[in-house]
Amino acid sequence: MVGGGMPRGDPLVVGRVIGDVVDPFVRRVSLRVGYASRDVANGCELRPSAIADPPRVEVGGPDMRTFYTLVMVDPDAPSPSDPSLREYLHWLVTDIPATTGVSFGTEVVCYESPRPVLGIHRLVFLLFQQLGRQTVYAPGWRQNFSTRDFAELYNLGLPVAAVYFNCQRESGTGGRRM
């Protein structure tokens, strides 16, 4: 077991989401994320062309009086071997009522499609339970975002759910054309 009761074999532990992005936590809410016809499963690989548009996100929870914040980050920007921009914020949605999806929330930072250039990047969705509706301000920039600092600033505590996928540059793109 890793601190917080997460088994060492948990995909979030194996994929180093626990440690690089957040501390160990207990899953308490269902979180489903999907692009087009494919659901995101921990560690799956999706191509940049498949994630150009925002995903559909379904949040569980007890009832619609409970609100959640969704954060999407890339802890491997600009490259896994030199993550000097860790974390890169791709999306931030707040005030999502339980049992609904992100379309019912407030988009604080609009979705930016990941476009990894070097290496395999982890794209992480983290769901936090809010104490109530709250005003959240967009950070001044997307790079060097800290999920831990953000959660502390807005008194969100540890995540209640998370899922991640891997993404790398598609072969055959960006080359010279004759």
Curated annotation (Swiss-Prot):
GO biological process: regulation of photoperiodism, flowering
Matches recorded under InterPro entries: PEBP, PEBP-like_sf, PEBP_euk, Phosphatidylethanolamine-bd_CS
Swiss-Prot/TrEMBL induction comment: Follows a circadian rhythm expression with a maximum transient peak four hours before dawn in long-day (LD) conditions, but barely expressed in short-day (SD) conditions. Targeted for mRNA cleavage by Pooideae-specific microRNAs miR5200a and miR5200b in leaves in short days, but not in long days.
Functional description taken from the UniProt entry: Involved in the regulation of vernalization and of flowering time.
Entry comment describing in which tissues the protein is expressed: Expressed in leaves but not in shoot apex.
Family: Belongs to the phosphatidylethanolamine-binding protein family.
CDD domains for the chain: PEBP_euk
Name of this protein: Protein FLOWERING LOCUS T 1
